[in-house]
Curated annotation (Swiss-Prot):
Name of the protein in question: ATP phosphoribosyltransferase
Transmembrane segments: none
Lineage of producing organism: Bacteria, Bacillati, Bacillota, Bacilli, Bacillales
GO molecular function: ATP binding; ATP phosphoribosyltransferase activity
Any GO BP: L-histidine biosynthetic process
Oligomeric and partner information: Heteromultimer composed of HisG and HisZ subunits.
Enzyme class, spelled out: transferase
Organism: Bacillus cereus (strain AH187)
Length: 211
């Protein structure tokens, strides 16, 4: 088997995804005891892992540094990359939502100002609804934008809604459901087809058996 390099996101998705790889027989003990390391070799297979920021996973896969990647659908929607999206892993499920303070009126005809970390997704969503909005990109916590009057509402990923609730915001619209996706480098799918499809097929069977 030729070596397969897999890019994973650090943080929340990492905790959901590692058990899936273990369930298909890939040793992830180094990943679970990683310290500050970012590159790991599975002990019982020709598979290695790299841990990078979520926004960089698709870039590493697109450029062939990683053969396979696992990343949230939000990253793929916001950043168009020349990769294959192969499998919905069904973990890390969240929703894109429009949220604001209780006095926000989503039906107002006044041009709205929306704060978000996801300007591309937000622009497409409101364009499809036929609404002209001003979009302000925020890198940090967007929840504060409507509270301080920077924006009328926000577009953000909501998992439990606890952060919104703690800041006095409520969800006005649920836009899209998102989850972790397995992506593949286009060239690698040709040169390492058997190895990659072996992983994908085992993962798919594991997901189906768990439903």
């Amino acid at each position: 088997m030729r070596n397969i390099q897999i890019a994973l996101t650090k943080g929340r998705l990492e905790k959901h995804v590692i058990p899936l790889f273990e369930q298909i027989g890939i040793d992830c003990s180094e990943l679970k005891n990683k310290g500050r390391k970012l590159v790991f070799q599975s002990k019982n297979t020709d598979i290695s892992f790299i841990l990078v920021k979520a926004v960089d996973v698709a870039t590493y896969v697109e450029h062939g540094v990683a053969d396979i990647g696992v990343v949230g659908k939000d990253i793929l929607m916001e950043n168009e990359k020349d990769i294959y999206e192969m499998l919905d892993l069904g973990v890390g499920v969240c929703k894109f939502c429009v949220a604001s303070i209780p006095t926000y009126n989503p039906k107002s005809y006044r041009k709205k100002c929306i704060a978000t970390k996801y300007p591309h997704i937000t622009s497409n969503y409101f364009h499809d609804k036929g609404e002209d909005v001003e979009i302000i990109k925020i890198e940090g916590s967007v929840e504060i934008a409507p509270i301080l009057g920077l924006a009328d509402a926000i577009v953000d990923i909501v998992e439990t809604g606890k952060t919104l609730q703690e800041n006095g915001l409520i969800v006005f619209e649920e836009m899209y459901s998102i989850s972790a996706r397995m992506i593949v480098n286009k060239a690698a799918l040709k040169t390492k087809k058997d190895e990659i499809f072996s992983i994908i097929n085992m993962m798919e069977q594991e997901i189906l058996s768990g439903k």
